[in-house]
A protein has these predicted regions:
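Bacterial N-terminal signal peptides
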Residues: 11-24
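Conserved beta-alpha junction segments in alpha/beta enzyme cores
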Residues: 33-279, 284-288, 296-306, 319, ...
Length: 474
């Protein structure tokens, strides 16, 4: 099967064509801060896992929960200790955690783990029958006197942060030594396809979302995707204790049901937990802002299981490859990098005008004027978003914000083909969609000012941060 691996803007092509590669480990970076000394104690891993399902009546992205969930939403992760200050990775089955809520999540988990927020990565998987946390939006709404907002339920969101923090504190004394780690990839069959259909003139022609019944739109090629699922597996002796996977696609088969659910990635993750019950299975959504299952999904309930089975098969294959490739781990094998990036609000996002829209228009779900206002407010304050990188031997796991286009993930892989590079996106959800510079001139839903709160200028700082973390020579 042929896949278009990269369809990027001019600046992305320049980055890929001129970067020269060096082979050295990713150090601990945050601006000009010195590297954290590597400890001599053994590396340990503590998993945590809590319920993140909203109760009936609680706010979700597209209306309140009207029925109890059949399969819970989870907030789970790991704490790696023994290589400098602890490192925390967390994935939550919510549509997004943005702005001040993302800060609060990182701060809460950092305090529990005895580390700094700069060494904590929190990502949503982006399922749509799920909550949306944004404490900046919540504060702005309160200041404007807007009550009973249908989307933001900060009390519940803070409760989940507290649950996760308590789970970390409970897990740390039970941490297991990490003796080995391995990385593997497996191609995912018939899930991902590019949402943006581009014509011969380079302009947007049609949109192919998460579920499509139009045979003409279904018939277009998959387009630019990353067909591979990546897996990083940690072992304690012969026992797998954590499996971290990532795949770039919107994670929905169907939604707006009023029933909280983790959709097909959550089902796949559950299936894998039955295969390997000794490990915490931690799945992330990669740079899937312009990727969905539309070519292979018609929104029929039965197809959710089909997609889950395909994803679980790739998880199984990548796990097997990682097991085959496992290598001994020492504290020197583990590293963490953090580069703060300031993303400007796109031209035309005026705070006063957005505030008027918030007061005058009902909220119709993600995205809405309040989301643009929240990000633009933070951008005016030059708030930095941390782009981070976990090093485990020859593997690099990058952590990026927003609904990032897949071209960034492909570019990162091409920057360091000598390393095993993979990515989690949907970190700080504040920016909304983050397209390539070229995409903003093509048109389409993802780059509208109501969907993407940054402009084409975002590409440069993000690629620079990725290059810095991967230590690509300029």
């Amino acid at each position: 099967m042929m896949h278009t691996r990269l369809s990027a803007g001019r600046s992305l092509w320049i980055v890929l064509s001129v970067c020269s590669l060096v082979v050295r480990p990713c150090t601990n970076l945050r601006g000009e801060e010195p590297a954290v000394p590597v400890a001599l104690a053994p590396v340990t891993l503590a998993p945590f896992d809590v319920d993140a399902t909203p109760p009936v009546g609680s706010a979700m992205a597209y209306g309140p929960a009207v029925k109890a969930a059949d399969l819970q939403l989870r907030c789970r992760g790991i704490v790696l200790s023994g290589a400098g200050e602890p490192i925390v990775l967390c994935a939550i089955d919510w549509i997004g955690v943005g702005n001040a809520a993302h800060d609060a999540f990182r701060e809460g988990l950092a305090k529990a783990a005895g580390t700094t927020p700069a060494r904590v990565a929190v990502h949503a998987l982006h399922q749509h029958d799920a909550p949306h946390a944004d404490f900046t939006a919540e504060k702005l709404l309160a200041g404007m006197g807007v009550k009973d907002h249908p989307r933001f339920d900060g009390d519940f969101h803070r409760e989940v942060i507290a649950r996760a923090a308590a789970a970390i504190e409970e897990a740390l004394p039970k941490a297991k030594p990490v003796t080995h780690a391995g990385f593997g990839r497996a191609e995912v069959a018939q899930i991902a396809s590019n949402r943006r259909l581009i014509g011969p003139d380079g302009k947007f022609v049609a949109w192919r979302g998460s579920a499509v019944k139009d045979v003409t739109i279904k018939g277009w090629p998959e387009g630019t995707i990353d067909p591979d699922l990546a897996a990083l597996v940690f072992f304690s002796g012969d026992e797998a204790i954590a499996s971290i996977t990532s795949y770039a696609t919107h994670p929905m088969s169907y939604y707006r049901t009023g029933v909280p659910g983790p959709d097909f990635p959550g089902i796949a993750r559950f299936l894998r937990s039955q295969d390997v019950p000794t490990a915490v299975h931690l799945h992330f959504t990669g740079a899937g802002g312009n990727i969905a299952a539309g070519k292979y999904n018609d929104a029929s309930p039965s197809n959710r299981v089909v997609l889950a089975t395909r994803l679980a098969a790739a998880m199984r294959g990548a796990f097997a490859a990682a097991t085959q490739n496992k290598k001994p781990i020492t504290p020197a094998s583990i590293g963490w990098g953090s580069v703060p990036v300031v993303l400007a609000a796109r031209d035309g996002l005026e705070l006063e005008k957005l505030a008027e829209e918030v007061r005058g228009k009902p909220d119709r779900g993600t995205f809405a004027p309040i989301d643009a206002l929240a990000f633009a407010t933070r951008a005016r304050e030059a708030h930095a978003i941390d782009v981070t990188c976990l090093t485990v031997g020859g593997t690099r796991m990058l952590h990026l914000p927003g609904e990032l286009f897949v071209e960034y993930q492909l570019a990162a892989r091409q920057m360091r083909p000598d390393l095993d590079v993979f990515m989690a996106a949907y970190g700080d959800y504040g920016p909304g969609y983050i397209g390539t510079a070229a995409a903003y001139g093509q048109g389409g839903y993802e780059v509208l000012p109501t969907s993407s709160f940054v402009g084409p200028e975002a590409e440069g700082p993000l690629l620079d941060a990725i290059g810095t973390l991967l230590e690509v020579s300029k």
